[in-house]
Amino acid sequence: MAINAYSWAKDGEKNLSPSFKVREFRCSDNTDPIFIDSELVEILQKIRNHFGKPVNITSGFRTASKNAAIKNAAKFSQHLYGKAADIWISGVTVEQIAAYAETLLPNRGGIGRYPKEGHADRTHGWVHIDTRAAKSRWVS
């Protein structure tokens, strides 16, 4: 798969798949360009199709400065390369999302669980999904 560069201003409304647009992957600092891995989009579309509900992306591509400002963010986060997304789905648990993601990435990729339970500062839990070559799993 390929990592493609897009302009938030120019390509923001461009469809990457039936359910996802470029703007959904933009860094919260609104910097151009936005890097997005086409394989990540395919995985997220499969998750959307499986659960039949919208997938909310809370963090897609991140600039180095934005990543550095995030508490406990990995120094070489896959978000920096457009290969990661943090997602949640209304009415679907973190465990359900992660379990299905595991069927899509059984031997590689990153799947991180960030449950709401035990974290008063979180309005909902989320799952980190990335397309790295090695396999990595964690709970935070």
Predicted regions, residues:
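Catalytic cores and adjacent binding grooves of peptidoglycan-active enzymes
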Residues: 75-76, 80-140
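Extracytoplasmic cell-surface/polysaccharide-interacting catalytic and binding patches
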Residues: 1-50, 122, 132-140
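Solvent-exposed, flexible loop/coil residues
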Residues: 7-12, 20, 65, 70, ...
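A generic short-segment signal for beta-strand/edge and adjacent turn/coil regions
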Residues: 26, 50-58, 91-96
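Amphipathic alpha-helical interface surfaces
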Residues: 36-43, 53, 66, 83, ...
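N-terminal start-of-chain detector that recognizes signal peptides
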Residues: 28-30, 56-62, 101
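Extended, low-complexity, intrinsically disordered C-terminal regulatory tails
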Residues: 41-72
